[in-house]
Amino acid sequence: MSFIILGLSVPVTKSYQKVEEHLFFSHFEHLYRHQQKLAILQQKQRVLDISSTKIVTEGNSLTVPKSITVNYPYRLVIDQMGGNHSLAKIIFDMTDRRFKYQFYLGSGNYQKTSQSLHSP
């Protein structure tokens, strides 16, 4: 009986992990856009500090799920116009995928790309 329960728990755990990862990226993108809006409205720069465990801004934080690895710490500075101060490339690794966020200098825009970590 325990083998059946164990056998069923693995797919549920994997599904939960995928949902958690999807929600994390959705929240990260929302947090970034929200910080841009605040920078413009308050006419002061905003900072996102990204570590292996958290993404922290003034008044907000987002926990990085254990299934996601941040390659190294990043600091994104958003100016009063909502633009970036650097050409940051933030890389998030998971078991099977890598997501890269390439931020464009000055515009506040970014490009998100996904790459499989397994050979075809």
What is the predicted function of each stretch?
Residues L23-Q36:
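Short extracytoplasmic/periplasmic juxtamembrane "stem" segments immediately C-terminal to an N-terminal membrane anchor
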Residues M1-F3:
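N-terminal signal-anchor/signal peptide hydrophobic helix marking the start
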Residues G7, P11-H22, K37, L41, ...:
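N-terminal helix-rich module
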